[in-house]
């Protein structure tokens, strides 16, 4: 797999975000666990890869050769055309360690029986997305969590205010069903960071009898790649689950930083507040933890800073 492009530089790390809903037997998962861990160690990769009977989900960071080696090993056991991959670049390593884990689900909704490889909504490519969401008959739904939505979203999107993806089915039954009934001609358009949550969310909706369900192919990250900022309907930055915290429309690290105490994204203004202590507390968690917790957080921050200076 050739992942070189014009941005390739000896000073940049390559970040690959990928997933595939591909049914695997246990023997394949066992082999992949061993092979991917070995490749990660060999190429000094960092990141996380989740494997389950329903497929694979991961984000890894490292050299172009290392990232290519791991992806090529994965593709040997994937069905061609069912691998969603996005590449970006960062001047610093985006992760602190490398993990390959066996999970019940590659994205956790907590419901058995869903199969996005067989039942899924209508894919909408990035260059067609604006037309869909500009239509007043479209119900635009953000399937991400509320702390992700807080730093960026598509204009006019509905925020289900979920804390985790497991909360989404309850919101569908308590809120979305009545919204659709009140708007009989409605089309549903859903989006998430890279597309994986929408695959499962649209599969769930269809299983529950919803129709005219669409989702953004490749998610927000693909939209950033393919739609110019001047034509974009996106507002803000896109939260990502690594040390970059958030990406701007150029797929470069944005202005947000992470509070390592509570995990919330912070603006420069948040970091300038008197209550902020790096790695220990922020405005979101200033009253949330005990003194013992603060001491532990401070020691962890000291160790992180010491490690980064090596």
From Swiss-Prot:
Residues 134-232 form the Rhodanese domain. Its EC number is 1.14.-.-. Keywords: Oxidoreductase, tRNA processing. The active site is at residue 192. InterPro entries: Rhodanese-like_dom, Rhodanese-like_dom_sf, TrhO, TRHO_N. CDD domains: RHOD_YceA. It catalyses: uridine(34) in tRNA + AH2 + O2 = 5-hydroxyuridine(34) in tRNA + A + H2O. The keyword Hydrolase does not apply. Signal peptide: none annotated. PROSITE patterns: RHODANESE_3. GO terms for biological process: tRNA modification. It comes from the Bacteria. One of its GO terms (molecular function) is oxidoreductase activity, acting on paired donors, with incorporation or reduction of molecular oxygen. Belongs to the TrhO family. Catalyzes oxygen-dependent 5-hydroxyuridine (ho5U) modification at position 34 in tRNAs. PANTHER family: RHODANESE-LIKE DOMAIN-CONTAINING PROTEIN 7-RELATED, THIOSULFATE SULFURTRANSFERASE/RHODANESE-LIKE DOMAIN-CONTAINING PROTEIN 2. This is tRNA uridine(34) hydroxylase. It comes from Prochlorococcus marinus (strain MIT 9303). The gene is trhO.
């Amino acid at each position: 797999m050739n992942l070189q492009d014009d941005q390739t530089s000896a000073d940049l790390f390559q970040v690959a975000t990928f997933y595939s809903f591909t049914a695997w037997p246990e023997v394949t998962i066992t082999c992949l666990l061993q092979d991917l861990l070995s490749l990660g160690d060999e190429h000094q990769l960092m990141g996380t890869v989740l494997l389950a009977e329903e497929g694979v989900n991961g984000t890894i960071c490292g050299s172009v050769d290392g990232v290519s080696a791991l992806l090529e090993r994965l593709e040997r056991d994937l069905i061609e055309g069912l691998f969603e991959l996005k590449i970006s670049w960062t001047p610093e390593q985006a992760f602190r360690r490398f993990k390959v884990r066996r999970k019940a689900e590659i994205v956790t909704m907590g419901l058995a029986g869903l199969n996005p490889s067989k039942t899924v909504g209508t894919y909408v490519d990035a260059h067609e997305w604006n037309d869909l969401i500009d239509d007043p008959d479209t119900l635009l739904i953000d399937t991400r969590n509320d702390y992700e939505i807080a730093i960026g979203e598509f204009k006019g999107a509905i925020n289900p205010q979920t804390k985790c993806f497991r909360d989404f089915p309850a919101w569908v039954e308590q809120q979305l069903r009545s919204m659709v009934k009140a708007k009989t001609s409605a089309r549903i358009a859903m989006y998430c960071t890279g597309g994986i949550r929408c695959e499962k969310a649209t599969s769930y909706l269809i299983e529950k009898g919803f129709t005219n369900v669409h989702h953004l192919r490749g998610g927000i990250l693909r939209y950033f790649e393919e739609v110019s900022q001047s034509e974009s309907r996106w507002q803000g930055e896109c939260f990502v689950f690594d040390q970059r915290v958030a990406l701007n429309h150029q797929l470069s690290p944005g202005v947000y930083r992470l509070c390592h105490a509570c995990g919330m994204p912070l603006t420069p203004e948040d970091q300038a507040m008197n209550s902020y202590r790096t790695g220990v507390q922020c405005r979101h968690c200033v009253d949330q933890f005990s003194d013992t917790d603060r001491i532990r957080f401070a020691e962890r921050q000291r160790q992180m800073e010491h490690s980064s200076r090596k």
